Amino acid sequence: MSEFFLHSFNALSHGLIGYVVPFLFVLTIVVFFHELGHFLVARWAGVRVLTFSLGFGPELIGFNDRHGTRWKISAVPLGGYVKFFGDDTEASTPSPELLANMSAEERAGSFHHKRVGARAAIVAAGPIANFLLAIVIFAALFTFFGKPSTSARVDKVEAGSAASAAGFQVGDIVLAIDGTKIESFSDMQRIVGVRAGEKLNFTVKRGTETVQLQGTPEQREMKDPFGNVHRLGVLGITRQTAAGDVVTERVDPATALWLGVKETWFVIERTLAYIGGVFTGREAADQVGGPLRIAQISGQVATIGIAALVHLAAVLSVSIGLLNLFPVPLLDGGHLLFYGVEAIRGRPLSERAQEMGFRIGLGLVLMLMVFATYNDILHLAAS
């Protein structure tokens, strides 16, 4: 047992040295825009913003702007927060004593004295900013680097594979999967890869005819170029590419923006599908990762190039935006849940009920962090 933990520690200490800078680069971009969403809508709604912090804990460096907001970088770079006038904590829990003794002028700038719709808009602005950031990043990547458009042609069918059982033949070109247009081999790989065990309907061009096939991708463990193991859906089809076969299509900014929206929705859809699969037992929870895993992936992706690292930032931005919308007290979604109840009841929940909710939310978040970190350590030790 001691050897296992020693090996884990050595893997962590050796690996994280090369991962810290890319990790902080990615996380800082995502957190900054999340908090900027809260900040901008709060200012628009007339709320006085006391603090805009990247990180938690003691302040390392900061300054005050002309509106009295303290902008700072804090010691623990694993998130951030915006603190409003009237907040008791960084999680925007109210300070009953402060709220009770406010003057009319102070109430005008207090977050907790705003109408429930304004408060909901301020809270929702963080996750929305994450989604918008992802759309813009994806769109920029499509604009500057183009869109893969190598046809989804079948050059080889693995014997005994799902593709063989479905009736695929060499020379087939996949046109659509479950009605979704397939424009490239990578399009097909992405859909098949996340739908192991699901029956899929394929529209296939075979010579001059169009045929319909049904196949169920099988789940296999595949290693990426960095040695990380992923469980993916596989048909057993190979596309052999020669010089000139790999085509990248340039797209205009408007098309790139639409592709950015589609890419963002794809990440949202697959993330929700994975979470649903964990709860139903179809997916293993060992793929849930925390800061250590993100740091490792950031360092690995950084070796490919800045475009790949920025792409990772977009994916992480979607994930953080989505996570924050979960109806768990302490997260943005928990606040929105409370505001929804307040809108229906015509008055907020009692202080005791809200405090109990935040305690439960804190417990759930801490348990998730411990579980994710445990997974991270096992993953790093194995690699």
Predicted features along the sequence, with ranges:
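Functional transmembrane alpha-helices
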Residues: 2-14, 101, 105-117, 221-322, ...
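Small-residue-rich helix-interface/hinge motifs
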Residues: 15-99, 323-345
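Alpha-helical transmembrane segments of integral membrane proteins
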Residues: 22-26, 31, 311, 315, ...
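Hydrophobic membrane-targeting alpha-helices
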Residues: 136-144, 321, 325, 369-376
